[in-house]
């Protein structure tokens, strides 16, 4: 019988660790937290030092029973949850719930799941760090107070089922403020001027850009006219050596950003894949602020570079953490075995591991050495100059392995752009000059990676909170990830060639964006309400200062109860005051004007199922009319005219095959109705302008698709149909589907054959349901 019980957080980790320890050790998993604050209750005793009231969830009770039984049998219980604050709290909850004693309990931590790391942890146990536990407890209690106190105010003032949170609401604020910046942005016109010139000996022309933007078409035309007979010569020539240094090893946030840019992963996806890599023993702990690498890792990296690339590619480097309150772990994210260039696993795991491996190796590699040539080209009779630049990689250094990406990938840093051999004073011949109309770009919307970077810059949240925060604001429909179509402009192109200026036009779109975070109407309204009535909670500095206070608690400098008390005494009265405040209109409601036909008030607001327009007053005897906003319309900028058009629906288009054809808008968008058939109206057509012919075309297409889908019906049993589906032919009967055996000809089946298949399926033994136990999410 094993004398030692080791408890880790996840079953995958348990399996890996069990391989390293002998028969004297039994490894079990707690599947994350074994107890938490009660879900539906406030669960904080305000009268007694804000003591949290914990419960063991129903789905954890059997597990706790098993852990208690095994702990009783063991001589020593090793609590091996993660070393961050969340992991420390899990260890403390296990200690409390299992009724452990200091004599038989040891706390161990490790940053990688390797045999040497596990054995070292066993040799160097410690006690539970109660200060770290208190810091986690303070975060949990404060977030519960904010959520439980603010959410009912939102239900009362805006609509039911809304929620607020200390970090999530500030993240939404960032996205809303960026959207408002974009809305208020006024694009300014300018002309970008580029020349192609050549020397007598060069095979390729030199591309040079004018050193200033021209403000208008008139200025561009005047400039090109002056260049018709101008002389172009090299007025200055500089050659400078450049060095590029590698980026630091990955922290949680930089891994999330780089995986988003290079691999297209979401922040949550990155953390999920990294968790699997860690639990399989492939990488070190993935929640960390640190850029430090252990001396053992540095030694193996040096050996790897020297062996595979040679000594000239190696350069020892030490990196220092600059993040505020870095505390999550003591080492950066790196491969556990540097010699493992590749791993087995899923495609996602392989790609993320490859990214981590290359970044880690690059951190200890030599600088890339480049040579940058800049040529200034004077224009006879003008003050402006053309500038040509060329960059040549003399020694690739770390670029041999890895190049860090940026949010703006317009310049390819790895490109090798050479200039021909030039001399100062040399005259150049002109091939052509292009003056292209351009417009200044609006600020970009946040991608997930950009939002993580911004939150980290502001000191909001910690490595364990970035992914859950971004998931939460999307799950609660405050923010959606999507694309925005830009503004179309007719671009003027002016070309000077062979002494003549030619003008052409082309259409370009500015501001197109994909996979960006966009606030919903509900998100905008909730943000504006919280900004007006709870500015302290929404203040970036407040949220960052709270994180610092948690750090002080973790370091034992302050008592967690005192910090909570200081906050609650100011916050709670403010909540009560705002909750009781009488508002003239529901928050987010906006009066647009009066309907000229009826004289009734027209307003827009957030309804139970989303944004809508209202015709008539709620207080009047006559029931008001409601219409949902269409995709692309917003509570903040819909006009009276646009709102009134929504009340034109449903609209009768005419008759087709003896039945009326109408168009209307439902919860899922605009649709055409013909008898019992409903057909969605595509984005290319508007429900306000769709014609009968266009609607009939949609009806015919759907009828044709239905015809192909329908294999057979039975007059004696109208509810029974044989249908074609994406996974093959099947029987549909009373809202249930039944698979047709492969050896049966579906078209030849009789009603009795179908009944026999249904009866056989009903009598077949039920397959046991697979239950997947999940680790509790860290908050």
Q: Where are each of the predicted segments found?
A:
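Intrinsically disordered, low-complexity regulatory segments
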Residues: 1-140, 149, 211, 317, ...
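C-terminal or mid-to-C-terminal helical accessory/interaction module adjacent to the motor/catalytic core
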Residues: 113-195, 239-243
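Basic, low-complexity terminal or inter-domain segments flanking catalytic cores
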Residues: 2-5, 16, 25, 151, ...
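Short, polar/flexible loop-turn hinges at active-site or ligand-entry regions and domain interfaces
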Residues: 53, 81-83, 101-106, 125-133, ...
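Short basic-aromatic helix/loop recognition motifs at nucleic-acid
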Residues: 241-250, 263-265, 436-445, 722
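A conserved hydrophobic secondary-structure block that centers on an alpha-helix together
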Residues: 258, 262-269
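Metal- or metallocofactor-binding catalytic centers and their adjacent structured scaffolds
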Residues: 214-249, 256, 423-427, 434-436, ...
């Amino acid at each position: 019988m094993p004398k030692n019980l080791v408890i880790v957080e996840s079953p995958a980790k348990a399996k890996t660790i069990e391989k390293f320890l002998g028969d004297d050790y039994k490894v079990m998993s707690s599947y994350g937290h074994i107890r938490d604050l009660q879900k539906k209750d406030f669960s904080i005793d305000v009268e007694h030092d804000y003591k949290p009231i914990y419960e063991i969830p129903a789905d954890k009770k059997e597990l706790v029973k098993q852990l208690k039984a095994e702990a009783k049998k063991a001589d020593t219980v090793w609590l091996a949850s993660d070393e961050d604050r969340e992991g420390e709290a899990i260890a403390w909850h296990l200690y409390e719930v299992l009724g452990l004693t200091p004599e038989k309990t040891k706390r161990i931590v490790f940053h990688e799941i390797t045999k040497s790391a596990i054995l070292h942890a066993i040799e160097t146990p410690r006690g539970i760090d109660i200060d770290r536990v208190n810091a986690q407890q303070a975060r949990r209690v404060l977030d519960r107070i904010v959520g439980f106190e603010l959410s009912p105010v939102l239900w009362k003032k805006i609509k039911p089922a809304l929620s607020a949170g200390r970090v999530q609401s500030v993240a939404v604020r960032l996205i809303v403020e960026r959207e408002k910046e974009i809305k208020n942005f006024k694009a300014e016109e300018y002309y970008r001027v580029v020349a192609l010139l050549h020397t007598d000996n060069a095979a390729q022309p030199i591309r040079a850009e004018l050193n200033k933007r021209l403000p208008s078409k008139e200025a561009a035309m005047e400039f090109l006219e002056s260049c018709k007979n101008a002389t172009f010569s090299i007025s200055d020539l500089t050659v400078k050596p450049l060095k590029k240094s590698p980026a630091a090893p990955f922290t949680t946030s930089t891994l999330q950003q780089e995986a988003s840019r290079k691999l297209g992963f979401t922040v949550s996806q990155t953390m999920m894949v990294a968790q699997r890599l860690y639990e399989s023993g492939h990488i070190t702990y993935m929640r960390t602020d640190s850029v430090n690498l252990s001396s053992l890792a540095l030694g193996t990296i040096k050996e790897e570079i020297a062996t595979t690339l040679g000594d000239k590619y190696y350069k020892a480097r030490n990196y220092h953490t600059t993040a505020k309150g870095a505390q999550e772990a003591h080492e950066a994210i790196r491969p556990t075995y540097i010699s493992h260039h590749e791993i087995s696993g899923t495609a996602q795991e392989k790609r993320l591991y490859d990214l981590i491996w290359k970044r880690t190796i690059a951190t200890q590699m030599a600088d890339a050495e480049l040579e940058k040539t800049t040529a200034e080209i004077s224009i006879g009779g003008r003050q402006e100059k053309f500038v040509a630049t060329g960059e040549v990689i003399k020694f690739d250094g770390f670029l041999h392995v890895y190049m860090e990406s940026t949010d703006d990938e317009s310049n390819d840093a790895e490109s090798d752009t050479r200039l021909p051999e030039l001399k100062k004073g040399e005259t150049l011949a002109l091939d052509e000059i292009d003056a292209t109309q351009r417009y200044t770009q609006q600020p970009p919307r946040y991608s997930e990676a950009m939002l993580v970077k911004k939150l980290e810059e502001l000191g909001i949240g910690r490595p364990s909170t970035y992914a859950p925060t971004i998931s939460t604001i999307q799950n609660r429909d405050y923010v959606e990830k999507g694309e925005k179509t830009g503004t179309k402009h007719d671009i003027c192109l002016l070309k000077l060639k062979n002494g003549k200026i030619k003008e052409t036009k082309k259409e370009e779109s500015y501001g197109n964006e994909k996979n960006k975070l966009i606030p919903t109407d509900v998100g905008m309204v909730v943000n504006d309400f919280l900004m007006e009535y709870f500015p302290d909670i929404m203040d970036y500095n407040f949220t960052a200062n709270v994180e610092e206070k948690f750090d002080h608690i973790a370091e034992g400098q302050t008592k967690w109860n005192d910090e909570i008390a200081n906050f609650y005494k100011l916050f709670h009265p403010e909540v009560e005051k705002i909750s009781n405040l009488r508002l003239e209109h529901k928050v987010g409601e906006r009066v647009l004007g009066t309907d000229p036909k009826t004289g009734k008030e027209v307003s827009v607001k957030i309804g139970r199922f989303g944004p809508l327009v209202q015709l008539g007053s709620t207080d009047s005897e006559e029931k008001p009319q409601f219409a949902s906003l269409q995709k692309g319309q917003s509570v903040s900028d819909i006009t009276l005219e646009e709102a009134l058009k929504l009340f034109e629906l449903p609209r009768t288009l005419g008759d087709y095959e003896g039945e009326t054809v109408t168009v209307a808008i439902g919860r899922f968008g605009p649709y055409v109705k013909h008898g019992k058939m409903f057909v969605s109206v595509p984005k290319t057509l508007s429900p306000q302008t769709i014609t009968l012919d266009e609607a009939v075309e949609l009806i015919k297409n759907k009828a044709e698709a239905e015809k192909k889908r329908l294999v057979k019906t039975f007059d004696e049993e109208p509810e029974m149909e044989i249908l074609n589906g994406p996974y093959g032919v099947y029987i549909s009967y009373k809202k249930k589907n039944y698979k047709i055996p492969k050896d049966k000809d579906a078209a030849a089946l009789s009603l009795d054959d179908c009944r026999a298949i249904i009866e056989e399926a009903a009598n077949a033994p039920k397959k046991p349901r697979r239950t997947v136990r999940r680790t509790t999410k860290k908050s």
